[in-house]
């Protein structure tokens, strides 16, 4: 037994008051695994009990005080020595003294501000946790408990469609259109692709969802691109005037809301990447940023029904672009 552990010690346990009824959410850990954590939202109260159990009954524990903290923290993996705290709340549970028997302490952090979504990425981690500490002269006794925070949004007032023309002069000219520029995490991307000029032999076409994580500032900026999904649009050569519909369901993919300049430390953005491959394996692509957001748990119609309604509205809203193009000549 080491000198520092000689004498009385204690175990700490943190229990939330609503642990039996509060929902849990899966969240990815640094090693890529998934664990379930208690789920909270911005403004919710965090309350519970701290149980301090003496390891050796009958022996007193000298301490410099008990406290519990609620912390929101950003950790950049390339700068692990520095933790950037954007929320830091402290409650003192006991003054310095001696503890003769195991005790339980109540705590409550009322209407806690939780401005950002929990996130574990390639180069950064944003976490919220409770930390209970028994302060001692030589070595403190600590226990941490992580929670997960989701940020909810309302339906955006402005949500215009995305419409662009891309091509190679005298070789390829296409127009693509997506029904919206902002999607919730269980939404359906509905769109169309029109081939106005095809003079190269296209053999494959797909849409990729790309997640781009940006960390750091100034000269210390790191970018990580991750392909979340690949959606095959066609396999074979298109012809002039052909129109190909797109229906891409987002619910099956692991994504977070778009996160822009979080505490001036990192961003997470999403892009639709339109990719064409010709018979000589040359790749042509065009990226377009989209905004993702998380909606609350409200009653929704089935995703297939949503897709059908969105498709009907989208297809019936305008004359087909190839025809409109010909009419303008």
From Swiss-Prot:
<comment type="similarity">
    <text>Belongs to the VPS26 family.</text>
</comment>
<keyword id="KW-0653">Protein transport</keyword>
<protein>
    <recommendedName>
        <fullName>Vacuolar protein sorting-associated protein 26B-like</fullName>
    </recommendedName>
</protein>
<comment type="function">
    <text>Probable component of the retromer complex, a complex required to retrieve lysosomal enzyme receptors (IGF2R and M6PR) from endosomes to the trans-Golgi network.</text>
</comment>
<dbReference type="GO" id="GO:0030904">
    <property type="term" value="C:retromer complex"/>
</dbReference>
<dbReference type="GO" id="GO:0005768">
    <property type="term" value="C:endosome"/>
</dbReference>
<keyword id="KW-0813">Transport</keyword>
<dbReference type="GO" id="GO:0006886">
    <property type="term" value="P:intracellular protein transport"/>
</dbReference>
<dbReference type="GO" id="GO:0005829">
    <property type="term" value="C:cytosol"/>
</dbReference>
<keyword id="KW-0472">Membrane</keyword>
<dbReference type="Pfam" id="PF03643">
    <property type="entry name" value="Vps26"/>
</dbReference>
<dbReference type="InterPro" id="IPR028934">
    <property type="entry name" value="Vps26-related"/>
</dbReference>
<dbReference type="InterPro" id="IPR014752">
    <property type="entry name" value="Arrestin-like_C"/>
</dbReference>
<dbReference type="GO" id="GO:0042147">
    <property type="term" value="P:retrograde transport, endosome to Golgi"/>
</dbReference>
<keyword id="KW-0963">Cytoplasm</keyword>
């Amino acid at each position: 037994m080491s000198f520092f552990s000689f004498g009385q010690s204690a175990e700490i346990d943190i229990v939330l008051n609503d642990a039996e009824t509060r929902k849990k959410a899966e969240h990815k850990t640094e090693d890529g695994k998934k664990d379930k954590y208690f789920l909270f939202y911005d403004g919710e109260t965090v309350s519970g009990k701290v149980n301090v159990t003496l390891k050796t009954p009958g022996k007193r524990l000298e301490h410099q005080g008990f406290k519990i903290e609620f912390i929101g923290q950003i950790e950049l993996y390339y700068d692990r020595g520095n933790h950037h705290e954007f929320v830091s709340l402290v409650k003192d549970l006991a003054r310095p003294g001696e503890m003769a028997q195991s005790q339980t302490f109540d705590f409550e952090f009322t209407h806690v501000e939780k401005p950002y979504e929990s996130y574990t990425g390639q180069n950064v981690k944003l976490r919220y946790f409770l930390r209970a500490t028994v302060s001692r002269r030589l070595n403190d006794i600590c226990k941490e408990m992580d929670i997960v925070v989701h940020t909810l949004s309302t339906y955006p007032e402005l949500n215009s469609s995305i419409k662009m023309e891309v091509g190679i002069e005298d070789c390829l000219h296409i127009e693509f259109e997506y029904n919206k520029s902002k999607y919730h995490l269980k939404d359906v991307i509905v769109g169309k692709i029109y081939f106005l000029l095809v003079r190269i032999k296209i053999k494959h076409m797909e849409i990729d969802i790309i997640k781009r994580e940006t960390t750091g500032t100034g000269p210390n900026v790191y970018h990580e691109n991750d392909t979340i999904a690949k959606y095959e649009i066609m396999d074979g050569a298109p012809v002039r005037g052909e129109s190909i519909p797109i229906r891409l369901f987002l619910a099956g993919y692991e994504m977070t809301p778009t996160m822009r300049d979080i505490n001036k430390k990192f961003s997470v953005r999403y892009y639709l990447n339109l990719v064409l491959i010709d018979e000589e394996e040359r790749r042509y692509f065009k990226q377009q940023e989209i905004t993702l957001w998380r909606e609350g748990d409200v009653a929704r119609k089935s995703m297939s029904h949503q897709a059908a309604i969105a498709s009907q509205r989208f297809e019936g809203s305008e004359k087909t672009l190839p025809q409109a193009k010909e009419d303008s000549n």
